[in-house]
Amino acid sequence: MSQRRGHNRRVSIETLENVENPLEAGLTILGSTLTVDDISLRIVEVEAYGGEKDGPWPDPAAHSYRGRTPRNSVMFGRAGRLYVYRSYGMHFCMNISYGPDGVAGGVLLRAAEIEAGHDVVSARRSPDRPSHQWARGPGNLGASVAITLADNGTDV
């Protein structure tokens, strides 16, 4: 993942491993560029979550709050992996894990601006919807890059 703040720079796994808290994780990922095949997206909205109730960043809204399960285990693993889940039984949403291995944390990717691959995304999205809405909202963002549960655990 590269980050644009005047110039492109890489958000490394080491950076995500050493994040001190959810706010820092969100700020690290906000503005970065996610590339999936021929599509490049600049992340413009995120939601950062802490982890378990007994962890360093307890967060009741986090999928990891009640502990590790088969569904959320990616959030407890090494930093820089996708945690993909189905929302409302129909939309796939993406989080990027952060923090040290064994400590849960995730940043939900809520919205992005498409920088490259407009033709690919337009074939996946409704022709009646304006292009600035194709990756607005976590479900739309996931659909724009065709994320599925098979992508869960993928390195970013």
Question: What are these regions, as identified by a protein language model?
Answer:
Residues 2-156:
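Conserved, well-structured core segments that form or line functional sites
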